[in-house]
From Swiss-Prot:
UniProt keywords, alphabetically: Clathrin- and caveolin-independent endocytosis of virus by host, Clathrin-mediated endocytosis of virus by host, Disulfide bond, Fusion of virus membrane with host endosomal membrane, Fusion of virus membrane with host membrane, Glycoprotein, Hemagglutinin, Host cell membrane, Host membrane, Host-virus interaction, Lipoprotein, Membrane, Palmitate, Signal, Transmembrane, Transmembrane helix, Viral attachment to host cell, Viral envelope protein, Viral penetration into host cytoplasm, Virion, Virus endocytosis by host, Virus entry into host cell
Gene from which the chain derives: HA
Post-translational modification: Palmitoylated.
Residues listed as glycosylation sites in the UniProt record: 26-27, 139, 150, 222, 303, 310, 497, 524
Gene Ontology BP term (one): clathrin-dependent endocytosis of virus by host cell
Signal peptide per UniProt: 1-15
First-listed, main subcellular location of the protein, grouped into a coarse class: virion
Spans through the membrane: 529-549
InterPro entries from the UniProt entry: Capsid_hemagglutn, Hemagglutn_HA1_a/b_dom_sf, Hemagglutn_influenz_A, Hemagglutn_influenz_A/B
Naturally occurring in which organism (per UniProt): Influenza A virus (strain A/Turkey/Ontario/6118/1968 H8N4)
Protein name: Hemagglutinin
Amino acid sequence: MEKFIAIATLASTNAYDRICIGYQSNNSTDTVNTLIEQNVPVTQTMELVETEKHPAYCNTDLGAPLELRDCKIEAVIYGNPKCDIHLKDQGWSYIVERPSAPEGMCYPGSVENLEELRFVFSSAASYKRIRLFDYSRWNVTRSGTSKACNASTGGQSFYRSINWLTKKEPDTYDFNEGAYVNNEDGDIIFLWGIHHPPDTKEQTTLYKNANTLSSVTTNTINRSFQPNIGPRPLVRGQQGRMDYYWGILKRGETLKIRTNGNLIAPEFGYLLKGESYGRIIQNEDIPIGNCNTKCQTYAGAINSSKPFQNASRHYMGECPKYVKKASLRLAVGLRNTPSVEPRGLFGAIAGFIEGGWSGMIDGWYGFHHSNSEGTGMAADQKSTQEAIDKITNKVNNIVDKMNREFEVVNHEFSEVEKRINMINDKIDDQIEDLWAYNAELLVLLENQKTLDEHDSNVKNLFDEVKRRLSANAIDAGNGCFDILHKCDNECMETIKNGTYDHKEYEEEAKLERSKINGVKLEENTTYKILSIYSTVAASLCLAILIAGGLILGMQNGSCRCMFCI
């Protein structure tokens, strides 16, 4: 009878007013990886890698791009007559060169240090064409032309920035010399060339002199040239060749030239101004767009606040960092599956909560209560906001930690330096792999911390409610408290908002607890009496068995008793 009373009384505790601590769950299928787990279900994630791009070359903060159209940049610089559209002064934030552009150096030959010239020219933000020399007073014939350099309108022509000087009729080409002083407010790129005829006949026809000497000097340049006469393979109808050169004339410096033949003389130079991104994008298909962007990649424009992108490793402006990863997902919500086992690197355990609540939509953590007035659910805004703030800080933290300037720049090398180019590409690839590994490791660590902090947040909220209730409630062991006094909705609200006064309900709770303890005491006494009776009965049975064994042994002689006096 006593045992029945105990069970009935304990069962009645289910009728107590109850408040439970829980967390949000939903039907999200998002998963994240952590340092120690793969594909962990979470309520919400944020993709950190931008994969979308607008396939266009857009204006940037430094201005519009310059599209070279049918021309290579060296053709623009030296003034290929089919590139006259670029003769006007122009500016750019970056340059777009089409790999299939047909117009390069029209008269066959090579440009010395072409890659460096491309870099120096493209690094400026604009140029202004400056006339350096007027050859009208020289005893030469000016403005030589070639059928290799036809103009857009048809007919023979020649480069617009350099002048092909030949002998003066009837048959004169003496030494001529000139000088130019750079009084502009910046550096000037100047250009010249040397003509190498295919035979002596053409040499004397053009320059009279079989042996010529040309010199170009500045404060830092002192070069002399003689023609290398001889036939070459026919290119663009020419067996002759031209070597093309360039230099930089700094402010206040003097450029001097002297020649008696074979000099393709400097006529116009380029006054470079400002700084651009210094990039020449080579792409065949992406058009110039009527658009603006903060981030321009070689593959298109990106407008994204994400910290990473995998569109292109070459980019300009305020861009996400490039990583060779298709996806890096950051947990910005809670673990979305119930768990009853310890987990995490930081010791937080929320396994005492049986599972999340799908009905909680206005917060991450909160309360569910039941009393005589019904049931209710409410979010705890304070703990939710603190968790959201931490998530925001995590995103900023990732951006800050990855905010070291890193990008792969196209390195252009001459034929002789192809091995250097190959080594450079391998180094770039290794750096990219390391960068991607660092980014992934950082995200894994932040995900681990987020989920562990979630466990800790639930535990902290549980402990805070436990402190508020003090001895006025019983821990039900599953994230819930059975309250040992009547607690209406107003009372429940005070527990949730932290204004609950446990002393106000202390007497009622003590009385209820004493009833529970009394029932437990009676139950314990009953069990103790039963234990004593059982022990005594077992001892008597054992004694009877031992005595019976002795008597049986003495009767059959197997056991003797000897008494010694």
